[in-house]
């Protein structure tokens, strides 16, 4: 408990010191009810500042006692108080905050606490990171930080925008009572009230910014023309162009309110200037903002709402929420100031070393501008798309044995109703139309990607009957969910950040809305990325993070279909039911399609013969399906690929952790990986309702223990917390048994060690188990090497396309960007006729004849001194630019063949010389 105020009594014998508290689990939450509230005697301990701080914040006794116990634990940590004296007061404030949140007793606002300990938002949260807190506190801090970030970005945007709209020194004749600063203040507080009323989700950036544009439109119409800059002055002139008098000014708001609903010229100008979708902003304007303004009932003064009246209205909201007083942004209060280097405020581009190029530097984007740009990019793709199936899709539907069109349309309609209701429930009931707009975009993307997938499958299999795939409900729900996730992420900040710091609509929200299992959603991600070429780099990263979330925990939930699939595969294939360990060192194949993933199990690749068909029109879906099932045992493509990706993700994280903790014992990494991989393959039940990283940390601790390496679990947890994806709940709240959770140390002792004790002890013996191969780690599953691959024994080089997309939306393919594209072969694209192959064969034959004649004449072609590249104008000095494409190709073939012939002759001569020497 905190110290009591000192008494004025005679000196007495000091009480005996209290017994030392038991050592707490560093990774374990402390439940509020479990902490002992032992009343200690603090008469001789003078901490008047702590007492004064609690009194100033009106902290109740039980909260003060909890805060003091928290302070005792915090102050015992080595180095926590190093730096400066002020840090002690700040830590007291943090301990009071922690106690108040844990006990659900918050007698003060967050801003009042900041003012009392004189610290900024970021300083407060940085200090809080040094303390192990409960999940409850973590969630409260996360909510506050996200709200602050959004408010900070929006105020910065409003301040800059008002500077572009209003004149700081207007012409004479304007009342001195009205100025740009006053308009900024009333605009900001009106926006705060509107945001609290309309947007239920505090950290939504896009809807909030659209609402801000509505507020700006409202006050532009209320402002006198002499205060406005162009083009806003011209847009607002028909409304506020008449001269003002004090009496007329008093009735101005009522007069303009009648014109608000019909006049949208100002808001159209605002949308154009900020590159916003005008239809979306108008929807917010008519459905949300105008009803809010009508119900506000604020008093007008000089044509503008009274600042004092607005501020008093906001005061009530602020005191009720107990968090940030956003009015302080207007004063640039130090408690709300960001750090000098703040990644949220602007996405800064690196400074160029050449000062002459300073003028050409890219202007850094604010968070609002960044999100608006990503939305604009999505609109470019989807504006020309339809929210109904295209003629090509309808043709595919008609070619199916069972036409899926009716079911697809009904599914889209039914899911739409569910989506809009869930969206409105999360964001605000007034935003149901916004949800409808976003769902419409998702449906457009859904049909677009579906058509691309079917075209790709048609080219690959030469069939048009996809009845089985197109009548698969899970496939459609997964594809629709992925399209909606792309749209939702585009409109939120979660794409730019870690998923855990996103909004309430962040992944896996869409899975809950559609009642879709994460493992089924995972199956479509890779195919979605491959066929939709216009996805931005950031969106591909976002989908990759979604895939990681699924692989690390979401796919391992107890109701996941993954466990049934593992069991079926195990029963069918015996001990090698999962991905073979020997295949881990092989590169990950990236040629899986949606049909492979959703129509598996298919025949095991090891027992499957490979056939190549060119221009085969007689191939049907039935024949293809029967070919898949002619041999047994069956193997699930989706399960095999899932385990390969899980192994690679697991090893990558383990490798990072080992580099930080076991750099002096590099040989242990392979042993830890073997135990880790063995657990995932043979003890996969341990993953049920748990996290991949929990098994990783337990594997590391177990091997270090048996190898007599002094590595405490606390050290492992501390290093793990520094990983970019880490969450405290991963090691604080681990499933022990049904509905019972505890720390990761308890899980290791009572569950992990009990299950794997025999296996772990084997690594201490003289004959340890065979080590598992290290997985092949590509840079990314969705990035392909651009280096050509030479096929052994031939003069053929295979190089991937520079980009996977085909002709779409007027964008050129990589082959179109190559001057000699007519002699390039793109495997997987529509080849047209066989003329191309015949032309290549003819070139090869002609080059062979040229080589023979050259060899007979004794004048082989002279090899080039340097390589020629497929770029127009390269090597102009030797005249190659003026050669026709066929002649260049022949010359290259001749040069390559000549070089190989000379190398073979040289090798043969060397062999003969060696044999002659041996004979001698």
Curated annotation (Swiss-Prot):
A GO term, aspect molecular function: disordered domain specific binding
Mutagenesis or variant effect for residue 780 to A: Decreased association with HDAC1
SMART domains named in the record: CYCLIN, DUF3452, RB_A, Rb_C
Basic and acidic residues composition-biased segments: 345-355, 907-920
Location within or outside the cell: Nucleus; Cytoplasm
Sequence positions bearing N,N-dimethylproline: 2
Sequence ranges of Acidic residues compositional bias: 22-34
Keyword Nucleus: yes
Residue numbers bearing the N6-methyllysine modification: 802, 852
Region (Domain A) residue spans: 366-572
Modified residues (N6-acetyllysine): 865-866
Region ranges (Pocket): 366-763
UniProt xrefs under Pfam families: DUF3452, RB_A, RB_B, Rb_C
Region of interest called Spacer, as start-end residue ranges on this chain: 573-631
Region spans: Domain C: 763-920
Motif Bipartite nuclear localization signal positions after renumbering to this chain: 852-868
Cited function: Tumor suppressor that is a key regulator of the G1/S transition of the cell cycle. The hypophosphorylated form binds transcription regulators of the E2F family, preventing transcription of E2F-responsive genes. Both physically blocks E2Fs transactivating domain and recruits chromatin-modifying enzymes that actively repress transcription. Cyclin and CDK-dependent phosphorylation of RB1 induces its dissociation from E2Fs, thereby activating transcription of E2F responsive genes and triggering entry into S phase.
The name this protein goes by in its record: Retinoblastoma-associated protein
Organism: Rattus norvegicus (Rat)
Gene: Rb1
